[in-house]
Design a protein with these regions (language model features):
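The canonical Cys-X-X-Cys-His
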Residues: 30-33, 75
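Non-catalytic, surface beta->alpha helical segment in thiol-disulfide oxidoreductase systems
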Residues: 76-110
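Short pre-active-site segment immediately N-terminal to redox-active cysteine/selenocysteine motifs
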Residues: 19, 26-29, 71
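Structural cue for short, hydrophobic secondary-structure segments
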Residues: 24-26, 77
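Structural micro-motif
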Residues: 61, 67-76, 91
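Conserved helix-turn-beta segment immediately C-terminal to the redox Cys motif
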Residues: 18-22, 35-55
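A short beta-strand-turn-helix
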Residues: 3-21, 61
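CheY-like receiver
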Residues: 108-126
Length: 132
């Protein structure tokens, strides 16, 4: 599967409808973004079962702001509607493969449990347990 252009109009639906979504926040004027693009495209072909989205931060400033994107490129991975990875910087192919493998290996029941515990603690005004 090739990459999908994500906009504020299709972002939520894409994340809701797919179990595993990678998101590349980028801009056309960004040199590292242009260097990362072929690496990302190749990974999208290798992992055709996953959705590889791209957010043009110039055209989708509202979306970039909603995620607090401060530098580009930034790669984010969302599994089961939970952001499980977010990191600025262009990754080499090997590092991208490693990150995808780690995200695939996550026990999402544990992730959802940790999120629920953190939200409950936050609702009580407590700090989440850093040890998880």
């Amino acid at each position: 599967m090739s990459t999908v252009e994500l906009t504020k109009e299709n972002f939520d639906q894409t994340v809701m409808d797919n179990e595993f979504v990678l998101i590349d926040f980028w801009a056309s004027w960004c040199g590292p973004c242009r260097s990362f693009a072929p690496v990302y495209e190749t990974a999208s072909e290798t992992h055709s079962d996953l959705v590889f989205g791209k957010v043009d931060t110039e055209a989708q400033q509202e979306l970039a702001a909603a995620f607090g994107i401060q530098s580009i490129p930034t790669l984010m991975i969302v599994r089961d509607r939970v952001a499980v990875f977010a990191q600025p910087g262009a990754l080499p192919a090997e590092a991208l493969e490693d990150v995808i493998g780690q995200a695939r290996a996550l026990d999402m029941q544990e992730v959802h449990k940790s999120v629920a515990e953190a939200q409950a603690a936050e609702a009580k005004g407590e700090q989440p347990d850093a040890q998880g």
